[in-house]
Design a protein with these regions (language model features):
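N-terminal beta1-alpha1 cap of cysteine-dependent amidohydrolase-like domains
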Residues: 1-81, 85
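Amide-donor transfer/coupling interface in amidating biosynthetic enzymes
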Residues: 2-9, 126-165
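Conserved beta-strand scaffold positions in the cores of enzyme catalytic domains, especially
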Residues: 40-42, 120, 149
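Fold-independent oxyanion-binding glycine-rich loops
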Residues: 10-12, 43-45, 62-64, 96-99, ...
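Aromatic side chains
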Residues: 18, 86, 100, 160-161
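Cysteine-nucleophile active-site neighborhood
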Residues: 66-142
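Generic structural hydrophobic/aromatic packing signal, biased to beta-strands
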Residues: 27, 40, 59-61, 103, ...
Length: 165
């Protein structure tokens, strides 16, 4: 039996402040080692959404500065209903670094400005001088009814991760 993983990489051209595109490369390599085919589509500003959310296994979004996250957040608002339905129907979103903030109810940047949010995750974020950084090891065995998934182990440095609300 062969497996396929459909990934949508969102805004990696501008949300890649700490080399977050490496997360996608790592996932793809791990899939290759396991004989899992990866189908990748990319989406960014001023691009047509040329994919169906029902066909997506994983959405990946990297991190950026407050300024770029504000720009992306405004663009993401166009996809709010689709993204909320995706999450509510057990879709998986890997938000790296500060990109999780855009999915919350409130996000105040370092200047205290309220950035428009998708209001999908029940979180409020206020930027502060001191940040939490360090290594995290996550083991996750997602038991989707339609697929059998492997243990996914990800080493992350300097990033917050939220996979599901």
């Amino acid at each position: 039996m062969s497996f396929e993983l459909n990934i949508v990489d969102m805004y990696s051209d501008i949300l890649n402040i700490y080399g977050d595109i490496g997360n996608l490369k790592c996932i793809k390599k791990r899939c290759e080692w396991r004989g899992i085919k990866v189908n990748q589509k990319s989406y960014s500003l001023n691009h047509d959404m040329s994919f169906d959310y029902e066909d997506i296994d994983l959405i990946l979004i990297g991190g950026g500065s407050d300024r770029t996250q504000s720009i992306v957040s405004n663009d993401l608002l166009k996809q709010r209903n689709d993204l909320e339905n995706y999450v509510e129907n057990d879709g998986v979103i890997l938000t790296v670094c500060g990109s999780y903030q855009m999915f919350g109810h409130e996000y105040y940047d370092v200047n205290g400005d309220n950035v428009s949010c998708l209001e999908i995750f029940d979180i409020k974020t206020v930027s502060q001088e001191n940040r939490l950084i360090g290594n995290i090891l996550i083991e996750n065995n997602l038991g989707w009814p339609q697929k059998k998934l492997w243990d996914l182990k990800i080493m992350v440095e300097g990033h917050f991760i939220i996979i599901k609300p």
